[in-house]
Each structure stands twice: as structure tokens, then as C-alpha cells.
Amino acid sequence: MTKDLNKKLVLGILFIFPLLVYLFFASGKNNFAKLPILTEKVNELPKGYLGEKIKLKNKITILGYWGGDLKNKKAEALNLNEKIYKRFYQFDDFQFVFFVDTFQIKQVQELKNELVKGVGTDISRWNFLHTTAENMKTHFSSLKTPFLLDESGNTPYVFIIDKDLSLRGRNDDEDSGTLYAFDARSVAQINKKMIDDVKVILAEYRLALKIYNSEREK
């Protein structure tokens, strides 16, 4: 009995300890804390104009709103592709989703071509949701942030949405106090903050999965 218990304890430590170490080093000042929830019950995604059925539920999502402004989004897209997507796209349930205007079909394809040409990455987890300006505004308002979309339905800010449709971010950021989103124009902010925060939320879910699997094996 004691031997079995000791064996389970050792196995538990072997599974969990490396994840705790990873979480500690990946999370910067967040240490072992989960990435804070800033807004709960973000709206689920509407069905796309082209029949897209992309969902936030049960996904870890980098969410953006580019509206009808794709011609000016190449730099932001390449920043995110190189610094975030390329680094994390192989994690289960990780995705990028960007709202775009219903008439941006050609522009989306051109941008995808640039992304592939830029880093040669599999971009199957880059999702573009074609929808109306009204749908974009309605969904954006459910984030409950201080930001606004411009007239074309665009913002340079991208958001982390967890599997339960909650907006994650920082509530103790040294620069802004509450950090709702990341400026895709700023390589410095992506490097300094966004990479760390994506690592934290991915490690959080990996740790939860390890604990769940460990409990099932008992």
C-alpha cells in the first residue's frame, strides 16, 4: 500500500514539477499565477459570410479585428506571424482569428500569400472571419475594453481569449495598470509582454491537462 502510494507520488512529481518550472520561467512577473481574467462571457463568433464556422469555445485564441483595412495590415500580420504564431501554432487548440469585412476576400488571400512567403509557416490556424461591420462592432463590444474600432472596423490591438470565452490579460501591468490587449504594431511589446502571456496561458492548460490525466490514472 505504502509502496504504491510512494510510486504515485513520484510519478506525480515527475509529471507536474517540469510544468511548474516551465510556468515559473515563462511567466515573468506573473510567476505561478494564472493569467488574470479581465472579461467573462465574451460573445461566441457569428457564422461567417462565406459559411465559416469558427468557434472560440475550447480554443486558445489570438483575436483581432481588421475590418476593411487589410491593405495596411501586412506589417502587423508579419509581426504576429513571426513572433507568436510561428512559435506556438503547434500547440493543441491554439488559433488566430481575425474579423474582416465581407468584401475582403481577395485581400485575405494576398495576405495569406505574404505570410507563407515571409516565414514559410503552415498557416492553417490563421482564420479570417468575413462578416458585417455591425457584427464586428457587436462582438468587439462584448470584450468590454476601453478601445474602439475605427470606421473600417479596425484596431491594431489583439486579444487573448481562453477556452471558456474569457478575455485574459494583466491587472498589474507596470505601464498601463490593466493590459487588455497587445499592439500588433509594436515588436517591443510583443517581445516583452505578449510572448510571456501566451506562454503562461498555454502552460496553464497543459498543467491542468496533466493533472486531469494523472487523476484518471489513479
For each feature predicted by the language model, list its residue ranges.
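Sec/Tat-exported extracytoplasmic proteins
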Residues: I84, F88, L143, F147, ...
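N-terminal targeting signals for export/organelle localization
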Residues: M1-Y49
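Solvent-exposed coil/turn segments that connect beta secondary-structure elements
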Residues: G68, T102, A133-E134, K163-L165
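Thiol-/selenol-based redox modules, centered on thioredoxin-like
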Residues: N154-K218
